[in-house]
Regions:
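N-terminal redox-cofactor-binding region of secreted/periplasmic oxidoreductases
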Residues: 1-158
Length: 158
């Protein structure tokens, strides 16, 4: 038995990556949770999108696959949660993935960090937009690194 609140995921906003932004403000698909005001955020409330649809939050994730920061896993292990260091969970990430590098080799996928043959297809965006390229160039100009694989060795950068 599967128990989930919300309706089925027939809404096209769920199945089109650009529709992601609309799911963030739609109470029919999002529980609309927010943090309490925090001093470190200028006393703002920060949205915590949680899916109110069959599939839960996975249905409103913009079709992105982003692993947690390795330091977070290592912190869990250091706090006594054996088996939860990044090195411990990495084999499971690899087993779950079917990573598709770009045909032209213009990516930074490290075979030691990614898997092939798993049920979760992970691929670089195939369609490039000039505006995105300009954003990345601007970020590099002011010192941010360009990161072609944010599930790789580091998640820092654009």
């Amino acid at each position: 038995m599967l128990l989930e609140a919300g309706g089925e995921d027939y809404n096209p906003l769920i199945h089109i990556p650009a529709g992601y932004i609309k799911t963030m403000v739609n109470p029919a698909m999002n529980w609309m949770f927010e943090t309490e005001p925090e001093e470190g955020t200028g006393n703002r409330r920060i949205a915590i999108p949680r899916g109110k649809v069959l599939g839960g939050s996975s249905a409103i994730n913009a079709m992105l696959y982003v692993r947690g920061q390795s330091a977070d896993y290592d912190d869990w292990a250091q706090r006594g949660n054996r088996g939860w260091s990044y090195d411990d969970v990495l084999p499971y990430f690899r087993k779950a993935e079917h990573c598709e590098p770009l045909a032209n080799g213009d990516d930074d996928f490290d075979d030691n960090l990614h898997g092939v043959g798993g049920p979760l297809n992970v691929a670089e965006v195939r369609t490039r937009y000039e505006a995105l390229d300009r954003l990345i160039e601007a970020a590099e100009t002011i010192g941010y690194p360009h990161n072609k694989d944010y599930n790789g060795a580091t998640q820092d950068g654009f």
